[in-house]
Protein backbone atom coordinates (compact mmCIF):
# COMPACT_ATOMS: atom_id res chain seq x y z
CA UNK A 1 0.00 0.00 0.00
CA UNK A 2 1.07 3.57 -0.65
CA UNK A 3 -0.03 4.78 2.79
CA UNK A 4 -0.35 2.85 6.03
CA UNK A 5 -2.04 3.74 9.31
CA UNK A 6 1.42 4.18 10.83
CA UNK A 7 2.27 6.80 8.22
CA UNK A 8 -0.93 8.75 8.94
CA UNK A 9 -1.23 8.42 12.73
CA UNK A 10 2.30 7.58 13.91
CA UNK A 11 4.10 4.64 15.48
CA UNK A 12 6.74 3.67 18.00
CA UNK A 13 10.28 3.26 16.71
CA UNK A 14 13.54 2.37 18.48
CA UNK A 15 16.17 5.09 18.85
CA UNK A 16 19.94 4.46 18.71
CA UNK A 17 20.04 3.21 22.31
CA UNK A 18 17.08 0.88 21.74
CA UNK A 19 14.52 2.92 23.69
CA UNK A 20 11.20 3.50 21.96
CA UNK A 21 9.98 6.91 20.88
CA UNK A 22 6.79 7.92 19.10
CA UNK A 23 7.15 9.29 15.59
CA UNK A 24 4.13 11.36 14.61
CA UNK A 25 2.23 10.50 11.46
CA UNK A 26 1.23 12.98 8.78
CA UNK A 27 -2.22 13.59 10.28
CA UNK A 28 -1.23 13.67 13.97
CA UNK A 29 1.72 15.94 13.24
CA UNK A 30 -0.28 18.53 11.29
CA UNK A 31 -3.73 18.32 12.92
CA UNK A 32 -3.05 19.98 16.32
CA UNK A 33 -1.87 23.26 14.82
CA UNK A 34 -4.29 26.17 14.99
CA UNK A 35 -3.41 27.55 11.57
CA UNK A 36 -4.92 26.44 8.30
CA UNK A 37 -3.00 23.39 7.14
CA UNK A 38 -3.19 20.92 4.29
CA UNK A 39 -1.96 17.41 3.69
CA UNK A 40 -1.59 16.85 -0.07
CA UNK A 41 -1.71 13.19 -1.11
CA UNK A 42 -0.78 12.27 -4.68
CA UNK A 43 -2.42 9.17 -6.20
CA UNK A 44 -5.13 9.48 -3.58
CA UNK A 45 -7.20 6.83 -5.36
CA UNK A 46 -4.59 4.19 -4.43
CA UNK A 47 -5.22 4.56 -0.69
CA UNK A 48 -7.40 2.01 1.04
CA UNK A 49 -10.30 4.01 2.53
CA UNK A 50 -10.23 1.86 5.67
CA UNK A 51 -7.03 3.52 6.90
CA UNK A 52 -8.95 6.78 7.27
CA UNK A 53 -11.46 5.20 9.68
CA UNK A 54 -9.75 6.65 12.78
CA UNK A 55 -9.91 10.13 11.23
CA UNK A 56 -13.55 9.62 10.18
CA UNK A 57 -14.49 8.53 13.71
CA UNK A 58 -13.14 11.81 15.08
CA UNK A 59 -14.98 13.77 12.36
CA UNK A 60 -18.20 12.07 13.44
CA UNK A 61 -17.72 13.19 17.04
CA UNK A 62 -16.24 10.07 18.61
CA UNK A 63 -13.26 10.10 20.94
CA UNK A 64 -10.45 7.86 19.71
CA UNK A 65 -7.73 6.40 21.92
CA UNK A 66 -4.40 6.14 20.12
CA UNK A 67 -1.65 3.63 21.02
CA UNK A 68 0.45 6.33 22.64
CA UNK A 69 0.93 7.43 26.26
CA UNK A 70 1.12 10.80 28.00
CA UNK A 71 3.91 11.51 30.49
CA UNK A 72 1.48 10.55 33.29
CA UNK A 73 1.01 7.10 31.73
CA UNK A 74 -2.51 7.66 30.41
CA UNK A 75 -3.46 6.82 26.83
CA UNK A 76 -3.64 9.74 24.41
CA UNK A 77 -7.08 10.80 23.18
CA UNK A 78 -8.10 12.46 19.91
CA UNK A 79 -11.49 14.14 19.60
CA UNK A 80 -13.30 17.40 18.89
CA UNK A 81 -12.97 18.24 22.61
CA UNK A 82 -10.57 21.16 23.06
CA UNK A 83 -8.92 19.40 26.03
CA UNK A 84 -8.03 16.41 23.87
CA UNK A 85 -4.29 15.82 23.28
CA UNK A 86 -5.00 15.83 19.56
CA UNK A 87 -7.77 18.31 18.89
CA UNK A 88 -9.64 18.23 15.60
CA UNK A 89 -8.79 21.39 13.67
CA UNK A 90 -11.67 22.43 11.35
CA UNK A 91 -9.20 24.55 9.32
CA UNK A 92 -7.24 21.44 8.38
CA UNK A 93 -7.95 19.58 5.14
CA UNK A 94 -6.67 16.68 3.12
CA UNK A 95 -6.18 17.39 -0.59
CA UNK A 96 -6.28 14.27 -2.72
CA UNK A 97 -4.81 14.34 -6.22
CA UNK A 98 -6.22 11.56 -8.40
CA UNK A 99 -6.59 10.29 -11.94
CA UNK A 100 -9.92 8.64 -11.04
CA UNK A 101 -13.22 10.31 -11.75
CA UNK A 102 -14.84 12.29 -8.96
CA UNK A 103 -17.77 9.86 -9.12
CA UNK A 104 -15.44 6.91 -8.42
CA UNK A 105 -13.94 8.75 -5.44
CA UNK A 106 -17.42 9.55 -4.07
CA UNK A 107 -18.31 5.85 -4.22
CA UNK A 108 -15.10 4.81 -2.48
CA UNK A 109 -15.01 7.33 0.41
CA UNK A 110 -17.72 8.34 2.87
CA UNK A 111 -19.57 11.65 2.55
CA UNK A 112 -18.38 12.69 6.04
CA UNK A 113 -14.76 12.12 5.04
CA UNK A 114 -15.14 13.98 1.74
CA UNK A 115 -16.61 16.97 3.59
CA UNK A 116 -13.11 17.64 4.97
CA UNK A 117 -11.23 16.50 1.88
CA UNK A 118 -10.63 18.36 -1.35
CA UNK A 119 -10.24 16.18 -4.44
CA UNK A 120 -8.29 17.41 -7.46
CA UNK A 121 -8.65 15.35 -10.61
CA UNK A 122 -5.83 15.48 -13.13
CA UNK A 123 -6.02 14.16 -16.67
CA UNK A 124 -3.73 11.44 -17.97
CA UNK A 125 -1.27 12.75 -20.53
CA UNK A 126 -1.47 10.89 -23.77
Language-model features: where?
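AAA+ P-loop NTPase catalytic core and its hallmark functional loops
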Residues: 1-126
Amino acid sequence: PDFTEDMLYGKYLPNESGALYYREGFITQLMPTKDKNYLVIDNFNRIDPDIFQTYINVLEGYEVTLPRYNKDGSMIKWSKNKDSFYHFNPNWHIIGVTYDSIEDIKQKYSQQFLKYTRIVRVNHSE
